[in-house]
Design a protein with these regions (language model features):
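Nuclease catalytic cores that cleave nucleic-acid phosphodiester bonds
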Residues: 39-122
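Domain-level signal for Mg2+-assisted phosphodiester chemistry and nucleotide/NA-binding surfaces
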Residues: 1-66
Length: 122
């Protein structure tokens, strides 16, 4: 099973949108497991206290209860994720274009959305 580390933006989109190919993603790239870093959960908890993102953050925190979590320390999720890719490589799920470029430059793979479909970028 391939673990896919989710950042905050990807997780919010995954939990608040209808994803067209969610059932077929496993057959396209092998069986995957979305993993939520503890630092992402911390970001979501902070967002749940803001007026603008409150409802999306609460919905996403509830959604994340059904996903595997992993301990990842750091003040900011992007920094922790970049450090993880630097040490271990892997697939990172994000919508953040700056983070995507950094992950790719370090040899990691990126999963994202296109037209509400999950895609693996090259």
């Amino acid at each position: 099973m391939v673990e896919v580390i989710c950042d905050t933006s990807f997780l919010i989109h995954l939990s608040t949108h209808k994803i067209k190919n969610i059932d077929s993603v496993n057959t396209e790239i092998g069986q995957i497991q979305f993993v939520v870093p503890s630092v992402v959960l911390n970001e979501l908890k902070k967002l749940s206290k803001t007026q603008k993102k409150k409802q999306d953050a609460i919905t996403t925190l509830e959604f994340a209860r059904n996903l595997k979590t992993t301990e990842m320390s750091g003040k900011f999720a992007d920094e922790a994720i970049i450090e993880r890719v630097r040490k271990r490589g892997g697939i990172i799920a994000t919508l953040d274009s700056e983070l995507k470029n950094k992950i790719k430059s370090l040899g990691g793979s990126v999963m994202s959305f296109s037209n509400d479909r999950i895609v693996l970028e090259s």
